[in-house]
């Protein structure tokens, strides 16, 4: 991995091959739920809205200890040519500011709840609101959020709850990875993240360590079927494991497919402490993973899309979930010699955590529920053709050429040896005949 080589140049200025497919959930029974005739909200998936994730690597420097330090920045750009849906369409969605703040204050004193209820009534805040798709993704604010961010900035550090805005607002981090020849199995795994050997999300080092984590742009060389890969995505707030599933053929090359286990977000089976749980909180049901430290402490959990592999009791809190393992699970296809991912898909759903909010009359019907907000799919659709050609030559053509050349050299060597032996025998035979002819010449004495 050196400057000037194709692999380095491709990584330093990566082609924009990652598509972000956004799916949002529209509440279709707004009136029935609000008047109490129906007890569960019905959600309809709307999407995809397709963006291209632009990745920039800057401030790149090679370190003397065999590591590489760089700053990675990501942003999402709307792709008009790939979209058939309008960002101006209207949605009925949960009022994230109201529900999130009441959930945050669920354990507050009576006086705090009373004061908050007065503010909510004065502002005529409703638990469900109508909003455009664009504003829901990028510019989701209201008078309650603006008021709270000014009055208690430590509790409400943002004044915009647009879901993509929250994901990409601070997506710029310094990463140090191993690249030296002595770090083959740790190639492009993290050594430091923002100058530390931990992410800073969790108190337990087991969950917070950067060791073996990778951003998924490159994996180590000579990947084996026994290897467990470690994928880190900032908005997931944790490292997730990938395990070998099967061999495949991709772009004419033999590849390995690694998958994300469906029980990744389950609680430990041995009953040990779940270090992805916030202090003072109870563990979430199986299939849910705490991500609020990565969303400004906003009460959020991640799951697989449509509550795939989530505790059925959680899925039954809302109507409209249609989990599909083939559509909603994640994988990465890797060329094992180089560790280069040729294709990958990863799906993640963000869900609002509403705790016991019985003390807040406008939202008490949402108490103790997990409300799906959106799910997104990250899809690396391939790699540039010049890189495909180079890889194909290295992993397919060159080994075969080497085999043919080796065989030709063996044949040539054997032929030369045979010719040499033949010539030697021929000379030896001529010499014997010469001596015999001398013996038959009559003596002149």
Predicted regions and their residues:
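Extracellular or lumenal secretory-pathway regions
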Residues: 1-254, 260-445
